[in-house]
């Protein structure tokens, strides 16, 4: 948008290879992938269209929709993993989690609901000026999402995980 508005823009690459978040790296022994590609689901269609990103080479071979776990994988140090090809629903992933903990398998659905509620709070602001904390608080005051926002703003990620799950 800066260049579109006539400003001079310089892009610098910190790494020894070009590609930034789209570069492929080994994130766990035997598992390679683009380390930040999972953020692409946040790329809004309006931005893609405004900047004509497809005309400049943007290609996305798939999107992840809620409940689609076929492209998600959770590797463990011993080489085993959960998710991945063949796991196409939250229920199938919960069944894999159940092998480790029935309580965590049930908690997985609460975890999904927490993040869906979080998304519903933030999504209206994706293409606007960021809201103030007061505006966010006002937007959920008196609703079931009030506690979700409080946790989003004041809890660490590890606190959220430990609140939901009994195992790593």
Positions of predicted regions on the chain:
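Residues within well-ordered alpha helices
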Residues: 1, 46-54, 96, 160
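Residues at alpha-helix termini
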Residues: 4, 28, 49-50, 99, ...
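N-terminal FAD cofactor-binding segment of flavoenzymes
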Residues: 25-70
């Amino acid at each position: 948008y800066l260049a579109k508005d006539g400003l001079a823009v310089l892009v610098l690459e910190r790494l020894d290879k070009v590609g930034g978040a789209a570069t492929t790296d080994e994130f766990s022994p035997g598992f390679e992938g683009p380390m930040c590609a999972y953020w692409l689901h946040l790329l809004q269609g309006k931005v893609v269209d405004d900047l004509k990103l497809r005309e400049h080479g943007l290609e996305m071979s798939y999107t992840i929709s809620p409940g689609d776990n076929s492209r998600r994988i959770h590797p463990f140090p011993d080489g085993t993993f959960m998710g991945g090809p063949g796991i196409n629903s939250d229920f199938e992933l919960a069944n894999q989690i159940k092998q480790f903990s029935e309580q965590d398998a049930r908690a997985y659905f609460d975890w999904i609901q927490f993040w869906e509620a979080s998304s519903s709070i933030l999504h209206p602001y994706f293409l606007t000026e960021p809201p103030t904390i007061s505006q966010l608080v006002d937007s959920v005051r008196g609703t079931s999402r009030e506690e979700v926002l409080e946790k989003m703003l004041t809890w660490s990620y590890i606190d959220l995980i430990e609140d939901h799950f009994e195992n790593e």
